Regions:
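Hydrophobic h-region of N-terminal signal peptides that target proteins for export
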Residues: 1-8
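Solvent-exposed strand-loop boundary residues in beta-sheet-rich modules
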Residues: 132-134
Length: 168
């Protein structure tokens, strides 16, 4: 799955570096989401970062997973949301908001997702979790939360992707 331009409250985006444009270091290979400023993977297997400035596996639009243009800017992130028989562990994205969420305020969450061209399987749910502490898992594996209020139920297909949004 490919993500771009992640979270907002009306006109004020509370996610720093929402289109993954600002990076620290050199992007050389898959699993380097951690060089995008403010972005992390909470498990031992990291998410991917793709850039128009690169070719091959990490290029935009053509890369290891097929062809996808960035929705905003020249970069985007990619995660593994499902693999048959869990052959390849899931990967996740994590970022700290630029300011804390206030009680009694409605926030609009919106992000773009697209199934990669070379994916054999699609998912019908994707979630977002808000917490006061960063999530961390020192191994490869699934992160499952019992609170399902942050789930989006859509079938993600490779046909141009979807903009998913909800109010919290």
């Amino acid at each position: 799955l490919i993500f771009s331009n992640i979270l907002g409250q009306d006109q004020n985006n509370l996610v720093g570096n929402p289109s993954f444009e600002s990076i620290d270091g050199k992007l050389k290979k898959l699993t380097q989401i951690n060089i995008a400023k403010g972005w992390y993977s909470p498990t031992a297997l990291r998410a991917d970062l793709f850039s128009k400035d690169k070719e091959g596996d990490i290029g935009v639009p053509d890369n290891f997973y097929g062809k996808e243009h960035a929705k905003d800017g020249e970069n985007y992130a990619g995660i593994v949301a499902y693999s048959y028989n869990n052959n390849k562990p899931r990967t996740y994205l994590q970022s700290k908001l630029t300011k804390s969420l206030a009680g009694g305020v409605d926030y609009c969450v919106k992000f773009n997702v697209s199934l990669s061209d070379l994916s054999k399987y699609a998912i019908d749910k994707i979630g977002i979790h808000f917490g006061s502490d960063a999530v961390s898992l020192d191994r490869k594996g699934d992160i499952i939360f019992s609170d399902k209020s942050g789930e989006f139920e859509h079938i993600i297909t490779p046909m141009g992707g979807k903009v998913l949004s909800a109010r919290y």
